[in-house]
Amino acid sequence: MGIVVQKFGGTSVANEESRARLVAKVIEARHDGKDVVVVVSAMGRKPAPYATDTLLDLVGSVCLTAPPRERDAIAACGETISTVVVAAALEAAGCPAVSLTGGQAGISTDSNYTDARITKIEPRRILEVLSDGKVAVVAGFQGVTERGDVTTLGRGGSDTTAAALGATLGAEIVEIYTDVEGVMTADPRVVPEARFQDTMSYTDLIEMANQGAKVVHLRAVEIAMHSRIPLAIKSTFSDSPGTLVADVAPRAVATFAPPRVVSAVTTVAERTQLVLQGDLYSDTGSVLGVFSTLADQRISVDMINVFPDRIAFIVASREAAAAVETLKELGIDAETNPGCAKVSVVGEGMRGVPGVMARVARALHDAAVRVLQTSDSHYSISCLVPESDMERAARALHAQFELGK
């Protein structure tokens, strides 16, 4: 029998009603003749008692500077609890299941606590469970080091667990179940005209994740792409087929229409622009020093523009004060421009196509949106705009590239 990996997020395991829907999805796959590996996240979101942030607060209330190793040890408890609850729910429905922690499932990681990388997976225990005719319910988001210490994989780590298990087990597909019915052309809270996409490429989903879309974790999509494992993004709460992510999006009928240049618009709010004045460009060491020092402080930098007389980039607004202080220690004064947002158009189809930037500029100009900064790659164009203009900018770009049709 083929193997299917099904990952269920926090809202899918949060209460009895959602867990009943989860159980139905698993039983349906088994009725289709599949061996099923279930990956689960912690139950619900803060202030739910077993949500990751709630558990971390237990440590934070005792020691604000708790070592990362200890934070990982308690953060991983949420997923471990979920595995037992879900396995019990499956058993109660007549579907035999075994709960496994990340370590029991054979997931090994490096020692980068709170943001560990999977180094290898030994799936022997999972395969034993499947060969016994049972469902393996695996804790997402966690693994163990060579010394046996528990680690976590960073936010979105359960997606990574599911993709890595799918690749290791040679799964037919990895199904990511969430509270939305698939990948949309934009955040519907920002662009009401956004629509669901039936199919899309790995490249487009990776670029969406790079530009801030919180659909599937970036590492998970990269693993799936490199392993050529299809991903299906579905809702636990509906029977919609969701969005299929694969090498070549299959179509029910032949089509001779040109591919879309842009497949989605993404938005990221609460950004602060930092501008460093001076002739830093002539001193490569100074430029490298700025960004390496910020990286050492774990401050993420985006939209970097280097000019002869200045450097401009953005950081999350919550990290702006720390970034300014770090730069002061280097003897560099930073001009800050808070209250910004990044709006991006994403699409594998734009590579090598002339005029995309012109269309972006025209749409934003016509919408009276002030552009503070731009950056681009082969598959995306990003514009920094005042946060107050973010929705207007996103809607203008969505309309410009006819993504609602």
Predicted regions and their residues:
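A conserved regulatory-domain signal marking ACT and ACT-like small-molecule sensing domains
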Residues: 242-405
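Electropositive, surface-exposed helix/loop patches at the edges of structured domains
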Residues: 130-145, 208-232, 277-278, 284, ...
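Terminal amphipathic helices with adjacent charged low-complexity linkers/tails
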Residues: 41-56, 233-252, 308
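Phosphate/diphosphate-binding glycine-rich loops and adjacent basic-rich segments that engage nucleotide
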Residues: 139, 192-197, 207-268
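Short hydrophobic alpha-helical runs that function as membrane-insertion/retention elements
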Residues: 173-177, 231-233, 302
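Nucleotide/pyrophosphate-binding catalytic subdomain
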Residues: 1-221, 384-386, 401
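Glycine-rich beta-alpha junction loops
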Residues: 43-44, 180-182, 227-231, 235-240, ...
